[in-house]
Amino acid sequence: MRKLNHALLAGALALACASCTAEKEANYQVIPLPQEVSLTQGNPFKLNENVLIAYPENNALLQRNAEFLSEYIQQATNYAPKTKAIAAGEQVKNAIVLGLDPGIANKEGYVLTTTPEGISINGQTENGVFYGIQTLRKSIPAEAKGATVLIPAGEIKDEPRFSYRGMHLDVGRHF
């Protein structure tokens, strides 16, 4: 009987330790769903206390976007990523890099690429980069305090479906 109690206690302790992992997984099942999500085989990017958010120097709007993302990551994980302006062509590791890409067709379109070395969010304009940040922000678990967030490797391409943003509320037909 004593051996059975010890075995049950050891099993419960092992199960409790296994459930207390310090890693949380991000999920790209966000609303609205991006137009194209392609996951790749490979290790995820680890969002932890050592991550840097980089943006092109002399771009105040992307600096503001970087600070916005840093504040959100701090709220969700208690890590405060530093933001840094980088020169054109400068490479940074373990970073979320914001940038502009005139090759993207839509002004509000973006491409979010995740590799084990980092994340890049490129848009044709600063607005496109902002919408890419929103997709990344929504994929991070809301409660990941002190945990390393594993962001799956892959690429997301998205742009607005319509040329306008808005809604129509017909109060006359609301019964």
Briefly describe each language-model feature range.
Residues 1-29:
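Bacterial Sec-dependent N-terminal signal peptides
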Residues 122-123, 165-175:
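The substrate-binding groove and active-site-proximal loops of carbohydrate-active enzymes
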